[in-house]
Amino acid sequence: MQDQKQAVKRVTGAFALIDSLRRHGVQHIFGYPGGSNLPIYDEIYRAEQAGEIKHYLVRHEQGAAHAADGYARSTGKVGVCLATSGPGATNLVTGLATAYLDSVPVLAITGQVPRSALGTDAFQEIDIFGITLPIVKHSYLVREPSELPRIVVEAFHLAMSGRPGPVLIDIPKDVGNAQIDYIPVEPGSVRRVGYRPTERGNPRQINQALQLISEATKPLLYVGGGAIMAGAHAEIAELSERFQIPVTSTLMGKGRFDENHPLSLGIVGMLGMHGTAYANFAVMELDFVIAVGVRFDDRVAGTGDQFAHSAKVIHIDIDPAEVGKNRSTDVPIVGDVRQVLGDMLQRTYHWERKLSRNKPRNGTDLNQLREPIPLTVPHPEDGISPQDGDWELSHQCPDAFYTTDVGQHQMWAGQFVQNGPRRWMTSGGLGTMGYGLPAAVGVKVAHPHDTVTCISGDGSFQMNMQELGTIAQYGIGVKVIILNNGWLGMVRQWQHMFYNDRYEATNLEDGTPEFARLADVYGLEAMNVRQRKIYQRRLPKALSHKGPMILDVRVTRDEDCYPMVAPGHDNSDMMGLSS
């Protein structure tokens, strides 16, 4: 008791908030000030003066949420964003939904009108607590200032444990100003009643899974974003090598396994609507699938049970709601992916001995598949193809962190860009145009000495191009590659394929700024590129430039992204394959 009494300090709620963030290792916050969150900003000022926390002023609150998202994905830590009440808070919504669908640990802190004004339709009052309930793991409205330290600890625990995701704390202005007796609450010391995610898989189900692995002749490890979030890269590699099981991934699972590894389904053996043909064909011939941290969503698995329709399926996921939701499962295992795979590996000796060494695995057949159905990179005589743009970028900068926006350029990047764990950031669930640039800001803040490249399109880039101001203000050295084809490219492709070339509201040739000139207005370096040879010469200079760099690459205008599985079709029914 004596120690506790000595630890008590009389402080404001805002001080307790910022000190609690600091105790969780928070060094960077992305945000935008307003009337309701000024008490918090006053404490951020003190923390910045002390060199404890750095705040980055974004140009739109959506950018703050995406920057916190990119920070979190690339580090495995909680990313923090901050907004004021009303429109500031609602501007976070798309960013929080993006993080929620991709299971990203983001802490959003919003200002709110004083408690006495709640429910009165006060200026800039909005029920952000209620608005965000479907798109966060948990929302808090802080009514008692003394509860702030506990709520922060609880929020970090919720964001990081189980299936990661965003958490929102809504703080009325008078709560931030209120004086409280502050006793710090140590990180990890608080657990939410009734919240106990299952981390260890059921031993009986793990044994059943190993039994099926030992009997399979055509197995496959199918890996998604859940494996990235769990940090299960080493366990996946060991399981694959120990049982000689080929590995493929979803768009969200890129980087989980060395794409040059003999057991990888190629560069890039990605499944789904725009996955590689050999990966999509191979999955239809399997007799066994180990699905790790995946959702079997429609862009990968089509109509669910059509996916690997002859195969038995083990589905491993931390979220019991995902197991068996879209594809029936023979052995469901609920638990932390890394823990479950680790437990499986500990038990494998017995099953390795049972594994018949003369049973062929499907690696040889897959090697044969790759040769007749490779990904192609067009080399137009006059210009540059978007595929060539992505391939050349990956070839010249293999160790970079990559963010993407959403559209054709995202799918081509998924096909051609190679990278390691936590070096690939894209909006795979919500499909948020405008994600890439602010996400790259967050990644670069977290990794100041690494190359961070945003791959965007001319449509997506205009969604959040105001964040060039943030980049300019803080000298954040991201490299932006805009694959500019003058279209909303993916929508145009669908209009071409399914709507008889009725191109309504997809032409961007008129009204789109010259991005290099726009960058110049912000005081940033930029280049225009229209020819492949010039691109090959200028790209190394752009990537090695110490500060920010924007490269406007005018690519061929009417290129379609193939292969493509039409909605509602199984993975073997692909469009755009040559006979």
From Swiss-Prot:
<keyword id="KW-0285">Flavoprotein</keyword>
<feature type="binding site">
    <location>
        <position position="458"/>
    </location>
    <ligand>
        <name>Mg(2+)</name>
    </ligand>
</feature>
<dbReference type="Pfam" id="PF02776">
    <property type="entry name" value="TPP_enzyme_N"/>
</dbReference>
<keyword id="KW-0460">Magnesium</keyword>
<dbReference type="GO" id="GO:0003984">
    <property type="term" value="F:acetolactate synthase activity"/>
</dbReference>
<comment type="similarity">
    <text>Belongs to the TPP enzyme family.</text>
</comment>
<feature type="binding site">
    <location>
        <position position="163"/>
    </location>
    <ligand>
        <name>FAD</name>
    </ligand>
</feature>
<dbReference type="InterPro" id="IPR012001">
    <property type="entry name" value="Thiamin_PyroP_enz_TPP-bd_dom"/>
</dbReference>
<dbReference type="Pfam" id="PF00205">
    <property type="entry name" value="TPP_enzyme_M"/>
</dbReference>
<dbReference type="InterPro" id="IPR012846">
    <property type="entry name" value="Acetolactate_synth_lsu"/>
</dbReference>
<dbReference type="GO" id="GO:0009099">
    <property type="term" value="P:L-valine biosynthetic process"/>
</dbReference>
<dbReference type="GO" id="GO:0005948">
    <property type="term" value="C:acetolactate synthase complex"/>
</dbReference>
<comment type="pathway">
    <text>Amino-acid biosynthesis; L-valine biosynthesis; L-valine from pyruvate: step 1/4.</text>
</comment>
<dbReference type="GO" id="GO:0030976">
    <property type="term" value="F:thiamine pyrophosphate binding"/>
</dbReference>
<dbReference type="InterPro" id="IPR011766">
    <property type="entry name" value="TPP_enzyme_TPP-bd"/>
</dbReference>
<keyword id="KW-0479">Metal-binding</keyword>
<feature type="binding site">
    <location>
        <position position="485"/>
    </location>
    <ligand>
        <name>Mg(2+)</name>
    </ligand>
</feature>
<keyword id="KW-0274">FAD</keyword>
<dbReference type="GO" id="GO:0050660">
    <property type="term" value="F:flavin adenine dinucleotide binding"/>
</dbReference>
<dbReference type="InterPro" id="IPR029035">
    <property type="entry name" value="DHS-like_NAD/FAD-binding_dom"/>
</dbReference>
<feature type="binding site">
    <location>
        <begin position="317"/>
        <end position="336"/>
    </location>
    <ligand>
        <name>FAD</name>
    </ligand>
</feature>
<dbReference type="InterPro" id="IPR012000">
    <property type="entry name" value="Thiamin_PyroP_enz_cen_dom"/>
</dbReference>
<keyword id="KW-0100">Branched-chain amino acid biosynthesis</keyword>
<feature type="binding site">
    <location>
        <position position="61"/>
    </location>
    <ligand>
        <name>thiamine diphosphate</name>
    </ligand>
</feature>
<dbReference type="InterPro" id="IPR045229">
    <property type="entry name" value="TPP_enz"/>
</dbReference>
<keyword id="KW-0028">Amino-acid biosynthesis</keyword>
<comment type="pathway">
    <text>Amino-acid biosynthesis; L-isoleucine biosynthesis; L-isoleucine from 2-oxobutanoate: step 1/4.</text>
</comment>
<dbReference type="Pfam" id="PF02775">
    <property type="entry name" value="TPP_enzyme_C"/>
</dbReference>
<dbReference type="GO" id="GO:0009097">
    <property type="term" value="P:isoleucine biosynthetic process"/>
</dbReference>
<dbReference type="InterPro" id="IPR029061">
    <property type="entry name" value="THDP-binding"/>
</dbReference>
<dbReference type="GO" id="GO:0000287">
    <property type="term" value="F:magnesium ion binding"/>
</dbReference>
<keyword id="KW-0786">Thiamine pyrophosphate</keyword>
<keyword id="KW-0808">Transferase</keyword>
<feature type="region of interest" description="Thiamine pyrophosphate binding">
    <location>
        <begin position="408"/>
        <end position="487"/>
    </location>
</feature>
<protein>
    <recommendedName>
        <fullName>Acetolactate synthase</fullName>
        <ecNumber>2.2.1.6</ecNumber>
    </recommendedName>
</protein>
<dbReference type="InterPro" id="IPR039368">
    <property type="entry name" value="AHAS_TPP"/>
</dbReference>
<feature type="binding site">
    <location>
        <begin position="274"/>
        <end position="295"/>
    </location>
    <ligand>
        <name>FAD</name>
    </ligand>
</feature>
